[in-house]
Amino acid sequence: MTSTFRHVALIGKYHAPSASAPSENASNALERIADFLRRQGCEVVLDTQSALHAGLTDYPTLDVDGLGRHCDLGLVVGGDGTMLGVSRHLAQYGTPLIGVNQGRLGFVTDIALEDFEATLTPMLQGEYEEDLRPLMCARVIRDGQCVFEALAMNDVVVNRGGTSGMVELRIEVGGRFVSNQRADGLIVATPTGSTAYALSAGGPMMHPSIPAWVMAPIAPHNLSNRPIVLSDANEVTIEVVAGRDVSANFDMQSLASLQHGDRILVSRAHHSVRFLHPKGWNYFATLRKKLGWNEGGA
């Protein structure tokens, strides 16, 4: 049968060039998947960097934004970190994404590499579950000017330096003062990010369909400062009141050396990420598999 998707972007996990050769496993995986897609009647276009580092020269290439403009499906081969970076770029184009897991846990890259042909064949023919995930937009305001802006799919984290003491942060939600908190830092996470850093800080796991965020302090001085679930319709403002070497992280994007008085404004982005999963996929099955629930049980 002919694929529902005509132009498919193939993006792989890659590293910066080094003296060593590119990973043979990564190269072989991309080549096998590209050949499979071509046999399904798809026009395959590789991300420029993926093709370069994997040594694949038989396919046309585009940068990530070019893929978003040209392709009607993105196939990401790697781990969740690879998917985080790609999804932030492609969300604005509405490009649906399928993740083939070549990492470890793989919460959003959920197709096993060894089973990709059997799993992808019906998906390419239109048999899939669609899953929308919200993005955060974060801006750093200094002296009334925006000095940094980024999107995040997992979380925004403000934290202290590795050798410094606690930071003091002033928190507002929807323009209303919440509290001044002294802690090692603060996490604002999406439902997608609720199973990442926020979970280790004691936050709850949130179903991805819930329009909410979790705000979780990291090692707070006052133990009554607990994680709280917020509506994602409200902007969260985090102001740096005191502390040395304070930094902010937006997924894997970092801004070091925040200054006293800097304000980090976190709001829901205009675009969401579109994930496609195999037919029958559900969130709770993912939790059982990735977190080891029911091991040894019925």
UniProtKB/Swiss-Prot annotation:
The EC number(s) this enzyme carries: 2.7.1.23
Cofactor(s) required for function per UniProt: a divalent metal cation
Entry keywords, A to Z: ATP-binding, Cytoplasm, Kinase, NAD, NADP, Nucleotide-binding, Transferase
InterPro entries found in the cross-reference section: ATP-NAD_kinase_N, ATP-NAD_kinase_PpnK-typ_C, NAD/diacylglycerol_kinase_sf, NADK
GO cellular component: cytoplasm
Location of this chain's protein in the cell: Cytoplasm
Major subcellular site: cytoplasm
Catalytic activity of the protein: NAD(+) + ATP = ADP + NADP(+) + H(+)
Binding site for NAD(+): 80-81, 154-155, 182, 184, 195-200, 219, 253
Homology family: Belongs to the NAD kinase family.
Function field: Involved in the regulation of the intracellular balance of NAD and NADP, and is a key enzyme in the biosynthesis of NADP. Catalyzes specifically the phosphorylation on 2'-hydroxyl of the adenosine moiety of NAD to yield NADP.
Protein name in UniProt: NAD kinase
Protein source organism: Delftia acidovorans (strain DSM 14801 / SPH-1)
Gene that specifies this protein: nadK
